[in-house]
């Protein structure tokens, strides 16, 4: 694949965290690096384990295939392969692939001399995965509290997990997570729509400037956050979708065992309206 005119300028040595020049190369448009190699290794091994574990199951229906975590009786120990051991190995591969990909992003950022905002943002969903598959099961004392790898089985797990606490919508972490999701979608949707509107004027009109963008939002909501800050806001909102969701998830079980509607009892005791 031919390089674009400006790409060679940025394909410089250095910036690697491990391996030095040994892994400091590109394959086509893709930077490899040590963590690119480790990511490929974990992805290949994990997918192979999923395929082999599926071959030991009762069906090849892609919707019904399920790699289940160990039974609660195994606690935090290693389980036999067909009784949750595959799930444990696949989870290790998933974490290895996710973390490798994040560190590869760090190396690319170091090469370009830019901030680490992208890898730090990617850390947030990795943290959410760790909460579900590692931290919460550790606090509860068994890997069996994690979710299975499968389409329908995962949906069943989400459904059953929510009903264990009567109504998951009353979970304050879930409430906050969904609120951040909706606000983020609205904010970045408005931003994207505005950029398209100023960059695609009607026939005979000139492309508009940042001043037009700022004035539009001043007219609509009385304030414009600015072209740079809207991306900071988007990062903040998107990160908090996972962070507040992780709080609500890890609190369920280790720190709160009753239905989430009961948690709101304090609201009824506030002197103003009690």
UniProtKB/Swiss-Prot annotation:
The keyword Transmembrane applies. (7R,8Z)-bacteriochlorophyll b binds at residues 154, 174. One of its GO terms (biological process) is photosynthetic electron transport in photosystem II. Keywords: Bacteriochlorophyll, Chlorophyll, Chromophore, Electron transport, Iron, Magnesium, Membrane, Metal-binding, Photosynthesis, Reaction center, Transmembrane, Transmembrane helix, Transport. The keyword Membrane applies. InterPro entries: Photo_II_D1/D2_sf, Photo_RC_L, Photo_RC_L/M, Photo_RC_L/M_CS. A ubiquinone binds at residue 217. GO terms for cellular component: plasma membrane light-harvesting complex; plasma membrane-derived chromatophore membrane. Residues 2-32, 112-115, 199-225 are cytoplasmic. It is a multi-pass membrane protein. GO terms for molecular function: bacteriochlorophyll binding; electron transporter, transferring electrons within the cyclic electron transport pathway of photosynthesis activity; metal ion binding. The chain crosses the membrane at residues 33-53, 84-111, 116-139, 171-198, 226-249. CDD domains: Photo-RC_L (cd09290). It is found in: Cellular chromatophore membrane. Reaction center is composed of four bacteriochlorophylls, two bacteriopheophytins, two ubiquinones, one iron, and three highly hydrophobic polypeptide chains (designated L, M, and H). This is Reaction center protein L chain. The lineage of its organism: Bacteria, Pseudomonadati, Pseudomonadota, Alphaproteobacteria, Hyphomicrobiales. The gene is pufL.
């Amino acid at each position: 694949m031919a390089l674009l005119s400006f790409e060679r300028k940025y394909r410089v040595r250095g910036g690697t965290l491990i391996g030095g020049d040994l892994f400091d190369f590109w394959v086509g448009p893709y930077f490899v690096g040590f963590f690119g190699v480790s990511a490929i290794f974990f992805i290949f091994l994990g997918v192979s384990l999923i395929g082999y574990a599926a071959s030991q199951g009762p069906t090849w229906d892609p919707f019904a295939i399920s790699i289940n975590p160990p039974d609660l009786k195994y606690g935090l120990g290693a389980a036999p392969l067909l009784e949750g051991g595959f799930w444990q190995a696949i989870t290790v591969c998933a974490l290895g692939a996710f973390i490798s990909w994040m560190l590869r992003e760090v190396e690319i950022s170091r090469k370009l001399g830019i901030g680490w905002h992208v890898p730090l943002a990617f850390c947030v969903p990795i943290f959410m995965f760790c909460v579900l598959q590692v931290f919460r099961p550790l606090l509860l004392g068994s890997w069996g509290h994690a979710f299975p790898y499968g389409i329908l089985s995962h949906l069943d797990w989400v459904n059953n997990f929510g009903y264990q606490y009567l109504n998951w919508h009353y979970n304050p972490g879930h409430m906050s997570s969904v609120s951040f999701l909706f606000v983020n979608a609205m904010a970045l949707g408005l931003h994207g729509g505005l950029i398209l509107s100023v960059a695609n004027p009607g026939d005979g009109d000139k492309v508009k400037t940042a001043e037009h963008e700022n004035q539009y939002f001043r007219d609509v909501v009385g304030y414009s956050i600015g072209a740079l800050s809207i991306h900071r806001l988007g990062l903040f909102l998107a990160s908090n979708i996972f962070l507040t969701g992780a709080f609500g998830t890890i609190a369920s079980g280790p720190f709160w065992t009753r239905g989430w509607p009961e948690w709101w009892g304090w609201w009824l005791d506030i002197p103003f309206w009690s």
